[in-house]
Amino acid sequence: CAADLGVAVLHAQPPTPDSDPLDRARRQGLTALFVATPGLTGPVVIKHALSGNCDASHIMDTLSSVESAMSQLASPRDVERLDDVSDDQEKSVHRVGTERRFAPNSMRARAKTTRSLPSKSHVIGDSFLGPLIEAAVHRLDLEADSAHTLDGVDAMIHGQILYTLGQCVRHTQNTHEGPLFAQTVLEFASGSFFADSAHPHIRRAAFVTAGLVATSLTAIPVAMAYADRTPLSLALETFTTRASERHRADYDADVRAAAAFALSALAECKLRASDAVDRLPDDPIDHGTPQITTRIAHAPITL
């Protein structure tokens, strides 16, 4: 099946010492499988790669392929409309009898836009983000149980996991589950293992991920989160506090720079939310018309 094929492609080994061509082919093959059957291959291959039975190169290839697949799935795809009435299509259709067309001007205007641009970003959460967090938690538990000493390779892997999670949120920002995914990734990255890690590479990755999440959030969900004090607003405030502390006191210059990036992105996110609230009408009901407008309570948002 597709999942077994994905695992087999992941473990393909080069017949010669020159492994670069096969490495590229492996990543391209995994990306193609993730795009074609994300729900079948994504969870299985991610779980296998982070189970402890694969080396660092296999894990990095898997995460790189996941990122490439998400980029393709979230990109708009050109799909011809079924009701296209352009001139080219009319020439290939032989009509019998007399056709009556109502609202010809509207139909003619609609025919000018002959393509729609859907995407498959809605499958990213179940296919990649959820399995990746679950596999990462399992890997952390295995390392804790075995008293594993964190080295540079482990820090690189954990940092890439966080960055891939940030890309998951970025590619799902226009889905209705985007704010929930952002909250989940922020809560995961703000854990003490990442944000307070002894390894600076992991701390830096945590704050870069927070910045990616903050730049991906749209204004209205953030405004609603601050108005209702939902877990998303609490996660944003928690990361703002952590980033402020690390920006002031961390000994690593790269971590301080990453914390500054996170602070700037979080402040921009709050500012967009505040502007969105200010642009909404004060009265939820316009008595001059029968329409009802949406209103969000004007909760104070401190920057």
At which residue positions do the language-model features occur?
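Helix-rich alpha-solenoid scaffolding regions
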Residues: 2-84
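Long alpha-helical repeat scaffolds
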Residues: 53-55, 59, 69, 78-303
